[in-house]
């Protein structure tokens, strides 16, 4: 059976949850337990998650994925992302720029800005996606920038003009 269904942000709690499962299994094996279903269901307060766990992936490739955003505030009827990943949130531009420059210093030639809905970048920090793009364009090195998963309604004329004339 299934003991837990975890959201994206809860993956960091897996070691503690395994200990809890093992402890419960140990107790259950020594005594007969009758728990009702409500005692077994755990629901995280995903709408309350404020922290952001940024990552970047490069390995031995020249392409580097840099996560700049997670979650979504659009509760579309067909989508479970807000329930699994929580509200839209992101790190500050200064933090992302450090990760990006580090990747370039390690040999990356392509930076792929990624997230659930990166056009929503800045909601949690009071910044704007266009400012992130400008910061990426100022990084040192010979590279290009790719944008992924940006909703069309969040692409402004300013963003389109900037990308069309960007150095990278």
Predicted regions span which residues?
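Proteins enriched for Cys/Gly/acidic motifs involved in redox and nucleic-acid/cofactor modification
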Residues: 1-120, 158, 167
């Amino acid at each position: 059976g299934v003991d837990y269904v975890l959201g994206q942000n809860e993956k960091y709690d897996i070691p503690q949850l395994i200990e809890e499962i093992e402890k419960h299994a140990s107790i259950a094996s020594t005594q007969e337990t009758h728990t009702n279903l409500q005692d077994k269901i755990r629901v995280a307060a995903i709408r309350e998650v404020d922290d952001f766990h940024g990552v970047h992936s490069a390995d031995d490739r020249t392409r580097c994925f840099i996560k700049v955003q997670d979650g979504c505030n659009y509760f579309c009827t067909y989508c479970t992302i807000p329930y699994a990943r929580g509200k839209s949130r992101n790190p500050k531009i200064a933090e992302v720029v450090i990760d990006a420059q580090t990747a370039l210093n390690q040999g990356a030639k392509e930076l792929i800005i990624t997230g659930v809905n990166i056009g929503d970048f800045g909601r949690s920090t009071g910044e704007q996606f266009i400012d992130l793009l400008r910061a990426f364009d100022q990084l040192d090195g010979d590279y290009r920038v790719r944008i992924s998963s940006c909703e069309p309604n969040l692409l402004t004329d300013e963003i389109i003009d900037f990308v069309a004339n960007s150095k990278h």
